[in-house]
Swiss-Prot record:
Keywords, ordered alphabetically: Cytolysis, Hemolysis, Secreted, Signal, Toxin, Virulence
Function: Toxin that seems to act by forming pores in the membrane of the cell. Has a hemolytic and a leucotoxic activity.
NCBIfam families: hlyII
InterPro entries linked to this entry: Bi-component_toxin_staph (IPR003963), Leukocidin/Hemolysin_toxin (IPR016183), Leukocidin/porin_MspA_sf (IPR036435)
Signal peptide: 1-29
GO molecular function, one term: toxin activity
GO biological process: cytolysis in another organism
Source organism superkingdom: Bacteria
Gene: hlgA
Cellular compartments annotated: Secreted
Protein name: Gamma-hemolysin component A
Length: 309
């Protein structure tokens, strides 16, 4: 039986002074409880925070697993939101005949903690995924049994489950690092279909074309040849599952980072041809890191800080 019951208590958002600025927006959703049977329940919290400066939104769902048959506290963190591509076209100031396209080669998503009483016990997605559409499920059975299924339609009956689903056309997801205190993913450009066939994301001439006009935009392929992750941005959907030693500290802090690494492609016309230069990771780690505090007893979530402000 599942019931969605709105909590009467108001969640403290923790709007400390450094967050009160015009470049940051914070909101929260209603808090809910889901009964998953045998006296166990999921206490759900949601936090939204937007950095207007970097055009990044974190929508984070915190699902506390309250299960007397499991000897630890558990928390499922689903990381959603939006990371704008910030693709731009411009003339170089000192050399206006050189046109530049800045575009996201990689999107960054990570979670980490320094709490010695907290361990990362599961995460999605795992391994390397190169399919355009990604969909996976995390399931929980009473007693502390977390499992992952290969897809939303995967087999298995769970007391509680959480799914991820996102599109990464022309990109590939890789786990860059993982240990008991965190995990870091990179969603990286892979290959692109062009009028001249399949082209590697590392190709020097990628996206450049013979100019159709004098503007910087005219030196690069039109929007209908660019995937959504370059035209607009990326909607992440990632999950981490964390355990906490019961009775060892009421609060823990987690840092969640979203961002992008930007490549720069330069194009200009010489006497005889179009010349193209490429700088990989020209603007790296254009990230936003939000520090969250969770209370294992009251199941409250607070935003402690955001970097950069």
């Amino acid at each position: 039986m599942i019931k969605n019951k709105i909590l009467t208590a108001t969640l403290a958002v923790g709007l400390i002074a450094p967050l009160a600025n015009p470049f940051i927006e914070i909101s929260k959703a209603e808090n809910k409880i889901e009964d998953i049977g045998q006296g166990a329940e999921i206490i759900k919290r949601t936090q939204d925070i937007t950095s207007k400066r970097l055009a990044i939104t974190q929508n984070i769902q915190f699902d506390f697993v309250k299960d007397k048959k499991y000897n630890k506290d558990a928390l499922v963190v689903k990381m959603q939101g939006f990371i704008s591509s910030r693709t731009t076209y411009s003339d170089l100031k000192k050399y206006p005949y050189i046109k530049r396209m800045i575009w996201p080669f990689q999107y960054n998503i990570s979670l980490k903690t320094k709490d010695s009483n907290v361990d990362l016990i599961n995460y999605l997605p795992k391994n390397k995924i190169d399919s355009a559409d990604v969909s996976q499920k995390l399931g929980y059975n009473i007693g502390g049994n977390f499992q992952s299924a290969p897809s939303i339609g995967g087999s298995g009956s769970f007391n509680y489950s959480k799914t991820i689903s996102y599109n990464q056309k022309n990109y590939v997801t890789e786990v860059e690092s993982q240990n008991s205190k965190g995990v870091k993913w990179g969603v990286k450009a892979n290959s692109f279909v062009t009028p001249n066939g399949q082209v590697s994301a590392y190709d020097q001439y990628l996206f450049a074309q013979d100019p159709t006009g004098p503007a910087a935009r005219d030196y690069f392929v039109p929007d209908n040849q660019l995937p959504p992750l370059i035209q607009s941005g990326f909607n992440p959907s990632f999950i981490t599952t964390l355990s906490h030693e019961r009775g060892k500290g009421d609060k823990s802090e987690f840092e969640i980072t979203y961002g992008r690494n930007m490549d720069a492609t330069y194009a200009y016309v010489t006497r005889h041809r179009l010349a193209v230069d490429r700088k990989h990771d020209a603007f790296k780690n254009r990230n936003v890191t939000v520090k969250y505090e969770v209370n294992w007893k009251t199941h409250e979530v607070k935003i402690k800080s955001i970097t950069p402000k």
